[in-house]
Swiss-Prot record:
GO molecular function: methylthioribulose 1-phosphate dehydratase activity; zinc ion binding
Protein name from the UniProt record: Probable methylthioribulose-1-phosphate dehydratase
Superkingdom per UniProt: Eukaryota
Organism: Caenorhabditis elegans
Pathway: Amino-acid biosynthesis; L-methionine biosynthesis via salvage pathway; L-methionine from S-methyl-5-thio-alpha-D-ribose 1-phosphate: step 2/6
Enzyme active site: 144 (proton donor/acceptor)
Swiss-Prot/TrEMBL cofactor(s): Zn(2+)
Cofactor note: Binds 1 zinc ion per subunit.
Amino acid sequence: MVEFVNDPNFKDLVVDTTIDNRNDEEPMTIRNFTELMIQFYKLGWMRGSGGAMGCISGSELMISPSALQKERIREQDVFVYNMKDKTEVQRPPNKRITVSSCSVLFSLIMKETGSECVIHTHSKCANLITQLIKSNVFEISHQEYIKGIYDPFSGKALKYSDTLTIPIIDNMPSESQLLEPIRGVLENYPQAIAVLVRNHGLFVWGPTWESTKIMTECIDYLLELSIEMLKNNIPLVNEEAFEKEDNLSDKMRTLMFGDMAPV
């Protein structure tokens, strides 16, 4: 595996380091990072050493290690990179531990979307929903937890009546091979804040670590709810949402990234 510091997307990643922690109520620290990883393990998102997280805090980028049991992660196990000079400033004492294979996916997503946090989970419902839905998108509308999802076009939260759309891509033998499919998602679904990987899991990204955590929790709830709705033949998208989508489709296509609120 090529050293992450040589990853072209990491090298091109530019962050405004004059803005500290943006709107986070609590700054991201290595201690908070490890505590979140343990919490995600307990939620069933990162079992068997799977799952990962990358987060920018000030001038530093923190990324979880690969093949390490997340419930036993320590502060010294986190990889830390300097965003200004693009150097590695911390790595685990155990030289056999490598940075997450998702690192190149995180840098791509951060570079293309301006996000400062990406969470990758292996939750059971994220896997199952991709097997129940045969299309290349997951959609759901008229659910309260949709209001917990950030809209990068407006800079505000989605409304209850909005349709949440999450693209679905096929799994690959290794996570690094998901680079081009995820690039395609970012190009074709610029409003997306997440992507599902069939038979695998979920990636969620956002402007802060707190908003990304909240969105991941909301999406996981909506995926679990959707599985039960499908079991009971309840449509995931309300008919009213289909009508609204037709009316908004032309408008959404005209929106440019320059019109977006800061991410």
